[in-house]
Amino acid sequence: MPSVYKGAGWRHPEAMKRAALIGIISLAGLLSLWLLLAWLGKTESNYRQPRPGMRFENKEDKASVPETIVVYQPRHFADGEVGHYQVRMEKGFLKMPAGKVTFAAQQIDHNGTTAWQFTLKGGALGGLVQYDARSIVNAQFTHSLEYHTVQKDLASRNIVLQFDPQQQRCRRQLNGNPDGVVDTEPSTFDPLSIIFKFRELNLARPGEFASAVCDGKATFQSKVRVVGREEIQIGDKNYKTILVEPDLGQLRGVFQKDPDAKLQIWLSDDSHRAVLRIRTKVKHGTFIADLADYQRPE
């Protein structure tokens, strides 16, 4: 399968396809990373509220002066970026298509304030299995604000996470009903936005990083190990990449049932740090998502 990215046997095949899609999507909750740099903290306004009855000489109503918002300028991902992936399953000599996944990043207006929105859309089995996720992160890119997932299959469900960065809480709803509250940390990301946070880090040297991630049931320090540089082939093209291996210890879902599960991610070794390949190995087989189409604003 050719890629257009440009750098700067088992018993139940349908169950395996579904596991492939859920496995690739679940890995987003794994991509663990990092406490925020201090300069990305909350911006404070120097506006001072006047005393009652006080009037300014220029007669302007300065009580309406808005708070200054600093919008994070990404180093690697881009506003308007879209990546389309083809997912396949491998077991022994057998290979078969398992589904499609699309990631996107966009700057939006969220309740009158600038925010970052990240989306994931996946499908398999001719549309019988669908998974949509949407993450909203504050303008400074320091904390998640909302996280929505809609899963349609035999176990269809709708999950909403509402983050309160000031109170350091996350409220979870399942199919419209309250489903618990958990504590978070000063800089906490959801299972989808953490993959974009990860791309922003300095991965030039091997090492290990950690960051707070909340899935609505728990907040945990998730770790990722930078293995080093590798060259991979997608279709007939070779790419220079950086291989990273997230720790699956806290990941829920298909990985939680397999202690030997392993996740590997290859990022482009260039200014984009695009996710070129995702590989998950569980007891059912190996699932691989390769970047097939990459769109980025000039």
Q: PLM features: what roles do these ranges have?
A:
Residues 11, 22-23:
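Compositionally biased non-globular segments, especially hydrophobic aliphatic-rich helices
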Residues 5, 11-12:
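Short, positively charged and aromatic/hydrophobic N-terminal segments
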Residues 158-200:
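Hydrophobic, well-structured mid-protein blocks that either form specific transmembrane helices
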Residues 16-19:
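Positively charged n-region of N-terminal signal peptides that target proteins for export
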